[in-house]
Structure formats: structure tokens, C-alpha cells
Regions:
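N-terminus-centered regions that define maturation/targeting leaders and the start
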Residues: 3-162
């Protein structure tokens, strides 16, 4: 199923559709510490990482994945978009030995998925003018379909109002 949602600038875009596989979170999932040198948890995301700037993914780093992790996956989503949110970036197949992403890059060997705009790769925050939206960066360490650890980082962005 594909639904259409409005996202900034009056453009209509398609919302990403989740894949057919699901993951199960372990009852004892560990915590990954996910952070960025560009912004703190709960703070505004700098303009260069948005549609109003260079539209590149921010630098991210995290604590080591737990033993037994087969890979890491990252999803960036705006839950404030009406109709169920908007996916800005998905990256899967990140090697468990990787502990950081440089700005504007996915790690070698990882797979970037389609975002809510229908393109592959990152698309930066772009809420309607005058509205503040929240952007949830969620990193999961997985083994098969089991989630071993989760880390979250939230940023905000507001475009100037009319």
C-alpha cells in the first residue's frame, strides 16, 4: 500500500512502504547510545542537514553493538507528518563493527532504501513553514529477526513561517 502525504512546500510525495519482513525485539534488548556531533538529543537539527541547506545526512556515532549482532539498521522518521509519519532515510546491512557514519555518507557495504519521497538515500527535514517537526533516528542491532539493542536520537527542525 502506498499513501500520499504532504511534506513542506506544498508538494505531494509518497510515503515509504515497510518491507515484508518484521523484526522481533528481544525482551532484554540492550541500549545503544546514539549521538551526533551536529546536534544534541531533543535539539534543533542544523540547516545544512535539511532541505533548506545541503540536504546531507548528519554525522552519527554510537556505542558498540552487542556480541552476536549480525548487522545494524538505521531509520530516520518524522512522526509529525499527518497520516502516519514520513521516512527520511533507511540504511540496512551496516556491519556490526561500524560505530559511526560521516555526514552525507552511508557506510560501505550497507544498503540504503527508498525514502518517503520515493528516492534512494537521505532526504532531509522539510516541514511546512512555521511548523516544528521531530525527527527520530533509530538504530537497531539485529541477529536474524531478533532486535538485540536499540538506540534513539531525536532532533527538531522548523522552517521560517510566512
Amino acid at each position: 500500500m502506498v499513501t500520499s502525504v504532504a511534506c513542506g512546500g506544498g508538494n505531494t510525495i509518497k510515503k515509504a512502504v515497510p518491507g515484508p519482513t518484521a523484526t522481533v525485539r528481544s525482551a532484554r534488548a540492550a541500549h545503544l547510545t546514539l549521538s551526533s556531533t551536529a546536534f544534541s538529543d531533543g535539539a534543533p537539527i542544523p540547516k545544512q542537514y535539511t532541505c533548506d541547506g545541503a540536504n546531507q545526512s548528519p554525522p552519527l556515532s554510537w556505542s558498540a553493538a552487542p556480541t552476536g549482532s549480525a548487522s545494524l539498521s538505521l531509520v530516520v522518521e518524522d512522526p509529525d507528518v499527518p497520516g502516519g509519519g514520513f521516512v527520511h532515510w533507511t540504511v540496512s546491512g551496516i556491519a556490526p563493527s561500524v560505530i559511526a557514519l560521516q555526514a552525507g555518507h552511508a557506510p560501505p557495504g550497507a544498503t540504503e532504501g527508498r525514502n518517503g519521497a520515493g528516492s534512494v538515500g537521505y532526504t532531509g527535514p522539510c516541514p511546512p513553514a512555521g511548523q516544528t517537526h521531530h525527527y527520530l533516528f533509530m538504530l537497531k542491532a539485529v541477529a536474524g529477526s531478533t532486535v538485540l539493542a536499540v538506540g534513539e536520537l531525536t532532533g527538531t527542525y522548523q522552517r521560517p513561517g510566512p
